[in-house]
């Protein structure tokens, strides 16, 4: 039998519409966990950067967009059904050590985090959801279903995998509804031997605390590399005071834009020709240095391209290089799912949609102050007209929800 994991996050930088009540949203059950939140944050950041480097290596000169937290959660759910070396490989790649943490604490920490992120009432909308589509002929252990439901709020559905097109439609319709139509299709060409599909969803809808004025947006050049440029819609904001840090050691500028509520986006702009140097330095300590060094700074003019990027990854080609191998092979031991060693993971599909545009707060809070020349200092201008990085974080624990490398703002 084969298990497929489908992961489909969407990050939307605009407030159009509201999120419906039919999403997989669950109230926070404030359970204590022995896994320290700072430890979980560092572990998740370490995994995020390791995965980023592998995706960037395998996709040179292409946009990279992914949700490390979404991928971690899907793998953690799979690990609930794993034993032996299969389990150890997954947890080690996620940066957990079973000699230092109890497995129960790991899952409680993850589940608690996902519930906290999904709490209603925040002005930033974050929806997390997990669904398991199980072939009607597959006998899944009650304990596995109970644990996935209790720890990760996984909703289980039965399907007929002998009719793959019907099952694909069932799964894709569910994904389309959960992502507010941003991801139209997650699975296609299901293999006949597939007997279970795990779907993980993370939907982020953020509104800028200080919005860009659409009247200022204009067509401009974005320099993909030294030889090629593309036309983009360049957003502009004037007289903005926002956290900023100039990292001379790594030759990059770091700027934070806040969303209303409890999230923010960190934009990292390497100097020309210094992207690889910045990428090589990505580790939890670097992120901590940047965040600790941010100070409010008056930006006279900020230029940021409007973004609409989608990516599609087959992570079964990437995760083995990070150390997760057994689960994709005949050696897979997922006997805590069915009670037998006859199940392996065939695919891990990760689809992401990243949209960022001008609109921000519900109040039309003004950005309308015009630039006034000052004597004594040159104007501070930050222009994102070449490749840059983005890390979207929730202020609860500063976990990276989404990470992106923007090579071409209008490309896939």
From Swiss-Prot:
GO terms for molecular function: serine-type endopeptidase inhibitor activity. Residues 360-386 are annotated as: RCL. GO terms for cellular component: extracellular space. InterPro entries: Serpin_CS (IPR023795), Serpin_dom (IPR023796), Serpin_fam (IPR000215), Serpin_sf (IPR036186), Serpin_sf_1 (IPR042178), Serpin_sf_2 (IPR042185). Residues 1-20 form the signal peptide. Pfam families: Serpin. Keywords: Glycoprotein, Protease inhibitor, Secreted, Serine protease inhibitor, Signal. The record marks 374-375 as: Reactive bond. Gene3D superfamilies: Alpha-1-antitrypsin, domain 1, Antithrombin, subunit I, domain 2. Glycans are attached at residues 97, 177, 262. The keyword Secreted applies. One of its GO terms (biological process) is response to cytokine. PROSITE patterns: SERPIN (PS00284). It is found in: Secreted. The single human alpha1-antichymotrypsin gene (SERPINA3) is represented by a cluster of 6 individual rat paralogs. Belongs to the serpin family. The reactive center loop (RCL) extends out from the body of the protein and directs binding to the target protease. The protease cleaves the serpin at the reactive site within the RCL, establishing a covalent linkage between the serpin reactive site and the protease. The resulting inactive serpin-protease complex is highly stable. Variability within the reactive center loop (RCL) sequences of Serpina3 paralogs may determine target protease specificity. This is Serine protease inhibitor A3M. The gene is Serpina3m.
């Amino acid at each position: 039998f084969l298990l497929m994991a489908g992961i489909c996050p969407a990050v939307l930088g605009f407030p159009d519409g509201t999120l419906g009540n039919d999403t997989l949203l669950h109230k926070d059950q404030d359970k204590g966990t022995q896994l320290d939140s700072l430890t979980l944050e560092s572990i998740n950041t370490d995994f995020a950067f390791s995965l980023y480097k592998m995706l960037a290596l395998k996709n040179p000169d292409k946009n990279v967009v992914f949700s490390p937290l979404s991928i971690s959660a899907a793998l953690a759910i799979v690990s609930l059904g794993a034993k032996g070396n299969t389990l150890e490989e997954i947890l080690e790649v996620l940066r957990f050590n079973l000699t230092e943490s109890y497995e129960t604490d790991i899952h409680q920490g993850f589940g608690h985090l996902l519930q906290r992120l999904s709490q209603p009432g925040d002005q930033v909308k974050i929806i997390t959801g997990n669904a398991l589509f199980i072939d009607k002929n597959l006998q899944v252990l009650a304990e596995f279903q109970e644990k996935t439901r209790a720890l990760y709020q996984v909703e289980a559905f039965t399907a007929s995998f002998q009719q793959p097109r019907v099952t694909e439609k069932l799964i894709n319709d569910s994904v389309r509804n959960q992502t507010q139509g941003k991801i139209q299709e997650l699975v296609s060409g299901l293999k006949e031997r597939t007997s279970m599909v795990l779907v993980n969803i993370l939907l982020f809808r953020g509104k800028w605390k200080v919005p860009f004025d659409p009247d200022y947006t204009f067509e401009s050049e974005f320099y993909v590399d030294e030889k090629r440029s593309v036309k983009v819609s360049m957003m502009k904001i004037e007289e903005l005071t926002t956290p900023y840090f100039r990292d001379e050691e790594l030759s990059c500028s770091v700027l934070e834009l806040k969303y209303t509520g409890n999230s923010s986006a960190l934009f990292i702009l390497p100097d020309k020709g210094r992207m690889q140097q910045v990428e090589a330095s990505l580790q939890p300590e670097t992120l901590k240095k940047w965040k600790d060094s941010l100070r409010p700074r008056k930006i006279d003019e900020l230029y940021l391209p409007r973004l609409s990027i989608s990516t599609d990854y087959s992570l079964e080609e990437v995760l083995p290089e990070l150390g997760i191998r057994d689960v994709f092979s005949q050696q897979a031991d997922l006997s805590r799912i069915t009670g037998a060693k006859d199940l392996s993971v065939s695919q891990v599909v990760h689809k992401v949609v990243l949209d960022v545009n001008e609109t921000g707060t519900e109040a039309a809070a003004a950005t309308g102050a015009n630039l006034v020349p000052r004597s004594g200092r040159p104007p501070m201008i930050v222009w994102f007209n070449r490749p840059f990085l983005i890390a979207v974080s929730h202020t609860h624990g500063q976990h990276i929800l989404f990470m992106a490398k923007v090579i071409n703002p209008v490309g896939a």
